[in-house]
C-alpha cells in the first residue's frame, strides 16, 4: 500500500540519521532494505528528513505545548519522545494496524473534530501528496483552533532541472515503490508563495524555517493560528 511505503521510507531515513529508533519497528524487512537503498542513492533526501525532524523537535521543546496534533502521523514516534504532552495522531485507518491510538482521518473527506482549544499542529511530509484544494481546506480547518502550526511543502523554486544519474535512478525506483507514474502532487511556487498562502488563510507570525543543507525541495513554515 502506497501510504505504508512512504511512511516506511521516512521512518527508515530517520533511523539512518540516528534520530528515531522507534518508528522503524513498524517497517518490514523488505521495505527497510528498499528505503535504505533509496537513501544511499539520494543522501540529500535523508539529510532533508533529518533536518526537518530536528527543527520540528526543537520547536516542540521551545513552544512546549500542552497538546500536539500530528496530521499524517505515519510511524512517527514523537508521542514516545515527548511523554508529558498530550498527542492526537491522525492518519488513514490503515495505520491503526500498527498504532492503536491513531485517529482515523482522511484529508479532503473528514472534518477535524478535536476537543482541544490550544495545540501545536504538525503536518509533516503530507502536502506534496495532496491536491491544492485539499491543502486549502486543511489549513482552513486548522485555523479554527488556537495555537501553532508547523507544515512543510515542496517548492518549485527549489527544483533543479539537471539531475545526476543517481537522482534519475532514485526517481525511477521511488515511483516503482510507491506505485505511481509521477512522484508528487501539490507544490508551492516559491517561499513567498507559501507565506502568501498563510496570509490568505488568516494565519499570523509566519516564519520560513531554513534548512542547513545545500539542496532540497522541502520548505518548512511556522505560523500562529
Task: List each language-model region with its residue ranges.
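Short alpha-helix
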Residues: 182-208
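Short amphipathic alpha-helix with an adjacent loop that forms part of the alpha/beta core around
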Residues: 109-117
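Conserved beta-strand signature within the Rossmann-like core of class I S-adenosyl-L-methionine
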Residues: 143-158
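A conserved beta-strand element that flanks and buttresses the S-adenosyl-L-methionine
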Residues: 121-122
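Rossmann-like AdoMet
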Residues: 1-69, 75-105
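A short, conserved alpha-helix within the catalytic core of class I
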Residues: 111, 129-145
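Core SAM-dependent methyltransferase catalytic element
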Residues: 210-225
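Conserved Class I S-adenosyl-L-methionine
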Residues: 163-188
Amino acid at each position: 500500500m502506497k501510504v505504508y511505503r512512504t511512511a516506511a521510507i521516512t521512518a527508515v531515513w530517520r533511523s539512518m540519521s540516528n534520530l528515531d529508533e522507534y518508528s522503524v519497528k513498524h517497517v518490514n524487512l523488505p521495505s527497510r532494505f528498499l528505503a535504505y537503498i533509496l537513501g544511499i542513492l539520494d543522501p540529500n533526501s535523508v539529510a532533508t528528513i533529518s533536518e526537518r525532524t530536528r527543527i520540528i523537535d526543537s520547536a516542540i521543546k521551545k513552544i512546549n505545548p500542552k497538546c500536539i496534533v500530528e496530521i499524517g502521523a505515519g510511524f512517527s514516534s514523537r508521542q514516545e519522545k515527548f511523554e508529558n504532552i498530550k498527542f492526537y495522531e491522525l492518519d488513514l485507518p490503515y495505520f491503526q494496524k500498527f498504532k492503536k491510538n491513531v485517529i482515523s482521518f482522511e484529508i479532503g473527506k473528514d472534518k477535524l473534530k478535536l476537543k482541544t482549544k490550544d495545540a501545536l499542529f504538525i503536518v509533516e511530509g503530507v502536502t506534496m501528496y495532496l491536491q491544492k484544494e485539499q491543502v486549502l481546506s486543511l489549513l482552513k480547518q486548522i485555523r479554527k483552533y488556537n495555537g501553532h502550526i508547523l507544515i512543510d511543502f515542496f517548492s518549485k523554486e527549489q527544483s533543479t532541472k539537471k539531475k545526476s544519474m543517481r537522482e534519475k535512478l532514485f526517481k525511477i525506483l521511488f515511483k516503482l515503490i510507491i506505485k505511481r507514474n509521477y512522484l508528487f502532487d501539490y507544490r508551492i511556487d516559491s517561499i513567498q508563495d507559501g507565506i502568501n498562502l498563510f496570509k490568505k488563510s488568516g494565519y499570523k507570525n509566519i516564519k520560513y524555517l531554513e534548512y542547513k543543507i545545500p539542496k532540497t525541495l522541502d520548505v518548512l513554515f511556522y505560523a500562529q493560528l
